[in-house]
């Protein structure tokens, strides 16, 4: 895990090294000051030598200023390194996620990926900054303080060393009991993010069905779960400070008692006892800092594993290792006894023994009841998923032989869920082809029957689209996404229920334009409405992940019970 994460340090290695270097020098100077203060008391104040007091006082101030500069430098370098490292980490994660297949996304879930990119990386940033500064400072401060304390009085050193194993045992006990809560907390954050995303995305449905109270209650449950888990973890961690305070008070009392006896017995000077107090406090404070570091590292460990899981996840769909095909000759599609299941461990097949040949330039309709795997079937063509068994061929070649960009540039898919991005309508259309000219944009929009309503908008093609396309209707959004797909000038065009929000007249105009202007493009149309596919060259009827029948509209009406029942039902409801 650590090796995976640290690859993202890259250009911030210098700052990562400079921060602990400054800390080490700072600690050496800082730990020398109590020793000087002891000399100042014993050789200056006790003897009435004010010249010595002034000289050592000025020297102490100089050391303190140097220590201040080094401390500020260490803070700057650690903050700079941690922020840069985290920026790289987020970039590496986001870049890697772009290569994920749908299977990878399904495994992690989009809500979990958002949490890992934000909350988890923030935890790692804090832990990294603490590790290259405080995690260096605390042990060095402890070691140097211990050395200085022993050099002053090994007897008094033994007094406070008794407290160290007690504190160490208490810290281990606290950490051991608190650690299991943090993975549960981050899983709860994933669930909260999922609910928030769903609510915001479906806010219109929430208001339409008056489900605000239910959504608020669900949100309360999620936040309450996080609160309870965090409260339990923090309750355990809260014992850390009282235990430390109690031990510090006990040690100081013991030092005062035994130190006073040594002074009375002329075995220790007053200044040396003052120095011992400082070194003892430094050692005990080091332990307190270490306990804080361990707390932060516990949270970061859970976050680190989650981030590393993303970075080390192998995309399930990749380019062929040797000589990928970089051109698609035609739009022929062949499903050769294709089987598919979403989970390889699952016994259930989403698709079973699909055997189908679609000729280049053919218009194929696909219909079936909800859950019959129509969308799953077409997802195999651009390799959004890979088949479990059998093969899918495009243009005479297995889709696994193609360069992914080449394949997907030649297979345009307009999915059920239409997504528009913040920007102008023209910007959204250019997702299909960044180099498209204005003439090509208008050509695609006219085929999709979008040119008319776009020109009626305040700024035409330069009209801004709000987040998620909230300022355009469902039918307008569908037509824009169809135009976007057409700009790819694909060999294969797949419309997955992409005209469900368009009126019948406009839909027919779209089909006529597609047939007229794209005669050589293979067109695959998935629809729940028979009127949308009845004029297709052939229609595939799917049922429970299998092809039940293939034929023209007239043929299927006569011989297929499922198709004829759907047609009859829709005809009766249209009257």
Q: What residue ranges belong to the model's regions?
A:
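An intracellular "coupling" helix at the cytosolic face of ABC transporter transmembrane type-1 domains
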Residues: 11-13, 99-103, 119-128, 132, ...
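Transmembrane helices of ABC transporter permease
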Residues: 11, 15-28, 63, 130-185, ...
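Membrane-integrated ABC transporters
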Residues: 1-33, 37, 45-59, 74-78, ...
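Helix-loop-helix
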Residues: 49-53, 148-162, 232-306, 310-311
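ABC-type nucleotide-binding domain
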Residues: 326-575
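Juxtamembrane helix-loop junctions of ABC transporter transmembrane domains
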Residues: 21-22, 29-42, 63-110, 114, ...
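Helix-loop junctions and hydrophobic alpha-helical segments within the transmembrane domains
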Residues: 93, 97, 206, 307, ...
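Conserved catalytic Walker-motif region of ABC-type ATPase nucleotide-binding domains
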Residues: 97, 219, 307, 335-337
């Amino acid at each position: 895990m650590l090796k995976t994460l640290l690859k993202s340090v890259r250009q911030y290695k210098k700052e990562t090294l400079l921060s602990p270097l400054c800390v080490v020098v700072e600690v050496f100077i800082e730990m020398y000051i109590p020793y000087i203060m002891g000399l100042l008391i014993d050789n200056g104040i006790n003897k009435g030598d004010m010249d010595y007091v002034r000289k050592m006082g000025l020297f102490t101030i100089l050391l303190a200023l140097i220590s201040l500069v080094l401390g500020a430098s260490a803070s700057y370098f650690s903050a700079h390194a941690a922020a840069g490292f985290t920026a790289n980490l987020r970039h590496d994660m986001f870049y890697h996620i772009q290569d994920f297949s749908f299977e990878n996304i399904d495994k992690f879930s989009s809500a979990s990926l958002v949490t890992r990119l934000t909350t988890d990386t923030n935890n790692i940033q804090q832990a990294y900054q603490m590790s290259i500064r405080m995690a260096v400072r605390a042990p060095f401060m402890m070691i140097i303080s211990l050395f200085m304390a022993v050099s002053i009085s090994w007897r008094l050193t033994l007094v406070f060393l008794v407290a160290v194993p007690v504190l160490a045992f208490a810290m281990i006990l606290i950490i051991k009991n608190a650690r299991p809560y943090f993975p549960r907390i981050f899983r709860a954050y994933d669930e909260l993010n999922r609910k928030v995303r769903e609510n915001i995305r479906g806010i219109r449905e929430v208001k339409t069905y008056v489900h605000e109270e239910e959504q608020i209650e669900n949100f309360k449950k999620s936040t309450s779960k996080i609160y309870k888990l965090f409260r339990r973890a923090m309750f355990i961690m809260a014992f850390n400070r009282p235990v430390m305070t109690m031990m510090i008070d006990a040690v100081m009392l013991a030092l005062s008692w035994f130190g006073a006896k040594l002074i009375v017995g002329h075995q220790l000077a007053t200044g040396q006892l003052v120095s011992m107090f400082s070194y003892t406090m430094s050692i005990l404070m080091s332990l307190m800092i270490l306990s804080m570091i361990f707390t932060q590292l516990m949270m970061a460990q859970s976050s680190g594993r989650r981030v590393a899981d993303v970075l080390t996840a192998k995309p399930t769909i990749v380019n062929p290792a040797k000589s990928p095909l970089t051109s698609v000759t035609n739009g022929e599609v062949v499903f050769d006894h294709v089987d598919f299941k979403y989970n390889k461990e699952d016994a259930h097949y989403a698709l079973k023994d699909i055997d189908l040949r679609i000729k280049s330039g053919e218009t194929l309709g696909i219909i079936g009841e909800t859950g019959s795997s129509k969308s799953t079937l077409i997802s195999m063509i651009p390799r959004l998923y890979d088949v479990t068994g059998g093969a899918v061929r495009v243009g005479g070649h297995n889709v696994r032989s193609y360069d992914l960009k080449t394949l997907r540039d030649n297979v345009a898919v307009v999915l059920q869920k239409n997504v528009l991005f913040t920007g102008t309508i023209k910007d959204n259309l250019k997702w299909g082809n960044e180099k498209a000219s204005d003439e090509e944009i208008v050509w695609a929009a006219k085929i999709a029957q979008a040119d008319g309503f776009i020109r009626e908008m305040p700024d035409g093609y330069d009209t801004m689209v709000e987040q998620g396309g909230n300022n355009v209707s469902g039918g307008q959004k569908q037509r824009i996404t169809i135009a976007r797909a057409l700009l790819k000038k694909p060999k294969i065009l797949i419309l997955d229920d992409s005209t469900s929000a368009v009126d019948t007249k406009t839909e027919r105009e779209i089909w006529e334009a597609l047939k007229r202007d794209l005669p050589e493009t293979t067109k695959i149309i998935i629809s729940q409405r028979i009127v949308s596919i009845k004029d297709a060259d052939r229609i595939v009827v799917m049922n429970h992940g299998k092809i039940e029948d293939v034929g023209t509209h007239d043929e299927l009406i006569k011989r297929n019970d499922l198709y004829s029942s759907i047609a009859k039902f829709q005809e009766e409801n249209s009257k």
